[in-house]
Amino acid sequence: MEFTPISPPTRVAGGEEDSERGAAAWAVVEKEHMFEKVVTPSDVGKLNRLVIPKQHAERYFPLDAAAGAGGGGGGGGGGGGGKGLVLSFEDRTGKAWRFRYSYWNSSQSYVMTKGWSRFVKEKRLGAGDTVSFGRGLGDAARGRLFIDFRRRRQDAGSFMFPPTAAPPSHSHHHHQRHHPPLPSVPLCPWRDYTTAYGGGYGYGYGGGSTPASSRHVLFLRPQVPAAVVLKSVPVHVAATSAVQEAATTTRPKRVRLFGVNLDCPAAMDDDDDIAGAASRTAASSLLQLPSPSSSTSSSTAGKKMCSLDLGL
């Protein structure tokens, strides 16, 4: 199996233009994407090695210990003994990177060791970044390997809301009612509403206002009023009827007996008592009638017991 030697791009004094030419040449090369890996903290740590997933390593970078050389599937660069291979890659600027690739029996993993730490430092890789590997297609790019990377996606800005404290409960002992604490009101972040014309306007505001992402808007929901319990006060209805009954009983009753109208006191409610009192009054008045001289005194005495109305 023959491999095309990779000639690194020539660096001149004003290396900026050469880098641009290398990037342009790298972009026009037809490449096949092989695999990519999200680097872990151990991949960019002090171990100075990159672990290649086993399925990708055996497919694209197989090791042939018997032949002492490898590079199936487009492995580029020189070979090595039983210690592994040296693979050469090109980045997007056309710069060549050489990594020692081998198999570790202790961890049973395929790793890239020598040269990897320099790539991490120069590209400033961090945990979560993605490293991708590719190979050239066609006669012009056959046997060339490519390496690239991209930064991890920044997490969407999370809104930190201050904790909402429930308002203190107030109790009115005079009215015997208690107000429970109101539930906390959720906060909603400021949202940008875009009209059909493409302008961003804050909700409820005119054009030209651009709300900041750090602002917040409070949306208050109507609260259901708490139930109020009043202390019941007993009402005595019997008092009104007693007053009405007392008013009716204070009126004197008039009875006509033997042609005489008698006004009896209100305390005598029983008919038998009224009749007995009337008969006694009539008898006493008849006994006093023959004495003309005592008519005045008898009438005065009769008024004390009950008023007489002689209808004779």
From Swiss-Prot:
PANTHER family the UniProt entry points to: B3 DOMAIN-CONTAINING PROTEIN OS10G0537100-RELATED, B3 DOMAIN-CONTAINING TRANSCRIPTION FACTOR ABI3
Location of the protein in the cell: Nucleus
Originating species: Oryza sativa subsp. japonica
Stated name of the protein: Putative B3 domain-containing protein Os10g0537100
Region (Disordered): 161-182, 286-312
Keyword Calcium: no
Pfam families in alphabetical order: B3 (PF02362)
Listed GO MF terms: DNA binding; DNA-binding transcription factor activity
Coiled coil stretches, renumbered: none
Segments of skewed composition (Basic residues): 170-180
The entry's keywords: DNA-binding, Nucleus, Transcription, Transcription regulation
GO cellular component, one term: nucleus
Record-annotated DNA-binding residue ranges: 35-153
Record's compositionally biased regions (Low complexity): 286-301
Record-linked CDD domains: B3_DNA
